[in-house]
Amino acid sequence: DTRYSFSDPWRLARVMDAVPALKVIAAHFGGWSMWKTGWQYLAGRPNLWVDCSSSLYALRPQEAANLIHRYGVKQVFFGSDYPMWDPVQELEQLKALPLTQDEQESILHRNFEAFLLGLG
């Protein structure tokens, strides 16, 4: 689907390869509806974080949890994609995932706090 070609994860991977020190936050698990391609191109990069906004409704809970673990829990931020989506629903979808309480707390705030403080 060419509508999403500008958010194709390989484009971001090329930028990150060209500028290795660049810190990047990629929305929608690195590429909306291209989640497998996203983690194939982007997972394992220590200077990349993804958010889970506007994605959890379209993934089965175990698929979403698998994506989170592929990127690494500490590399994932909670995002609501407000005003497009209801933050309460996005939060409920995150809390319904098969994740530990500690993993959820990391995604909800700890990871972003560390990122803002330069610790992430």
Q: Locations of the language-model features?
A:
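Catalytic pocket-lining loop regions of alpha/beta-barrel enzymes
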Residues: D1-F77
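Mid-to-C-terminal alpha-helical segments outside catalytic/metal-binding sites
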Residues: G72-F77, M84-G120
